[in-house]
Amino acid sequence: FVLQGGEDGYYTDERIIHLIRMIKEQYPDCAITLSIGEKSKESYQAYFDAGADRYLLRHETYNHEHYRQLHPSNLSPGHRQQCLRNLKDIGYQVGCGFMVGSPYQTPVNLAEDMLFMKELNPHMIGIGPFIPHHDTPFAGEAAGTLELTLYMLGLIRLMIPKVLLRPHCTWNHPSERT
């Protein structure tokens, strides 16, 4: 089971814990994966204690300056990276990742992302090309390429051979038939 959502105030820790326990009671042999954003270490521990097994949290970008160009000033890459470390310390199977070709991204940023993932040694990695959305400040930016994404996937496989590389819904090449 995957429980996924944004950072929605309706879903308090108590509600999430209740959902986890209900699922575990009915399906005790199934893993529960959460993808619900940045939380406190105490919240992560409570979800784990209730029965959650895995947590997906893209690190987005390791580089502080690049992160600031993509996110509001009240968010920080250091906090997000610490969340991933906390999750691993608790005992979750952890997934991280980033977008390839995001605005302002440099080859150095990609190298830093690779080194961070090598150090974190997550169980799962999800990357995919940046796709601009018309209702965002990045609407006019170029999309990331499939070629660079595949290249980065190859490097990840060489650096972390046993990691689960999760398929991404944006991997369809524009020239493919549907």
Regions found by a protein language model. Give the residues of each.
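Catalytic cores of alpha/beta
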Residues: 40-49, 102-118, 172-178
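Conserved C-terminal portion of the radical SAM core fold
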Residues: 3, 27, 53-54, 59, ...
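Active-site-proximal loop/turn and secondary-structure-junction residues that shape catalytic pockets
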Residues: 7-9, 36-40, 61-63, 100-104, ...
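Glycine-rich, proline-tolerant flexible connector loops at the mouths of alpha/beta enzymes
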Residues: 2-13, 65-67, 129-141
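Active-site-adjacent loop and "lid" segments of alpha/beta metabolic enzymes
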Residues: 143-146, 164-177
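Charged helix-capping and loop-helix junction motifs
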Residues: 14-19, 110-114, 144-149
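Radical SAM/AdoMet-radical enzyme domain recognition
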Residues: 1-2, 13-99
